[in-house]
Structure formats: C-alpha cells, structure tokens
Amino acid sequence: MLTTMRRHGIRLALFAILATALTAIVHQLTTRTIAHQAALQQQRLFDQVIAPDGYDNDLQRSCLLLRDPRLGDSSAHRLYLAQRQGQPIAALVETTAPDGYAGAIRLLVGADFSGKVLGVRVQEQHETPGLGDKIEIRISDWIDSFRNKVVHGAQDPAFRVKKDGGEFDQFTGATITPRAVVNAVRRTTLAIRDIRPHLASLPRCGESK
C-alpha cells in the first residue's frame, strides 16, 4: 500500500516538475516572440519618420530620456539618437500634443539639429472619426506635409494652420486637432534643435537621473 502511494506521489511530483518546466519554456518563447515583433513594429515606425539610409547606428539601442515642457508635459520622453559615423545627425522624440480635441495626442517627431522636420507619425490619438483622425497616415497623407519643413523659431508664422495664417491645412469641421499637432511638431523640433549641445548629459533609457 505504502509502496503504491509512494509511486503515485513520485509520478505526481514528476508530472508537476515537467508541467512547470514546460510552462516556463513556453512563457520564455512567447515573451521573446512578442518582444521581437514589438521591435520590428517600432523599427517600421522609425523608417516612416527618418530614412533608414540616413544613419548607421541602431536607433532602438540609442535611446535617451529628455525632459522639456515643450514636449507637452513634465515627464521624461524617449529620444532616439540617429548617428552617422559616430556623429549625431538627428533625433526622433516621442512627444505629446496635450490640447487635442479629445485629449492628448502622442506623436513621434523626427528632426535634425538645424530645425528641419524629417517626419512625423501619430502613435496614439482619440480624435473624432472622420474628422480629427485625418492626422493618421492610414486615413490621409496630411501628416506628411511636415516633411522637410524648417522651423525658424517659437513664433514662426508659417508653422501654423492656414486659419491662423500659416502653411498647414486644417480639416473641414476640425481645426483644433491639426492646430494641436502643428504646434506640437513646432515645439518638439525646437526642443530637438536646442538639445544638441547637451546630449551627453541625458540619461539613457532605463536609467534615472
């Protein structure tokens, strides 16, 4: 009787060990797959903002943290530094337009250190479907109107929607959304321009300072 019970106990213990090991292996493989897919998706987004042949470093491994009120809030924002032959040439910054019609709009803005916008993409928005959501590249190409535009200062009259005397189209029935994005792109581009001499002082992502 005791021998039979011991055998059952050993079998149950072995089964539990095998099940735990299998679960751990599956979890590890799944985690790696998810991380790999997330990295691919992030790189595809980067490629839409800055030309891949314009830099020669790994953007995802060149992440710094930038605090600047021009980025929409007081939190630390990710800055991905593009380099060529070891020299900084541009940056991609995750920024926020806090004054969208339906709340904050999260953007990825790429610019060089002379104030030229390289590209912009929307990362998250909750604007009105059919109106404000035209900032999304899958709906319209409006967001590409920033490409290669130069910001000449905080009061640059061209970097406004046409209703405010600037160069950028607003949407029919939705002026607040494009105005918020234009203003955020202008502010973020200036933040990128101004940070060039201070890059060495920025903490890397994952660090605190």
From Swiss-Prot:
Alphabetized UniProt keyword annotations: Cell inner membrane, Cell membrane, Electron transport, Flavoprotein, FMN, Membrane, Phosphoprotein, Translocase, Transmembrane, Transmembrane helix, Transport
Classification of source organism: Bacteria, Pseudomonadati, Pseudomonadota, Gammaproteobacteria, Enterobacterales
Bilayer topology term: Single-pass membrane protein
Assembly with partners or alone: The complex is composed of six subunits: RnfA, RnfB, RnfC, RnfD, RnfE and RnfG.
Subcellular location: Cell inner membrane
Stretches that traverse the bilayer: 9-29
Name of the protein this chain belongs to: Ion-translocating oxidoreductase complex subunit G
Cofactor: FMN
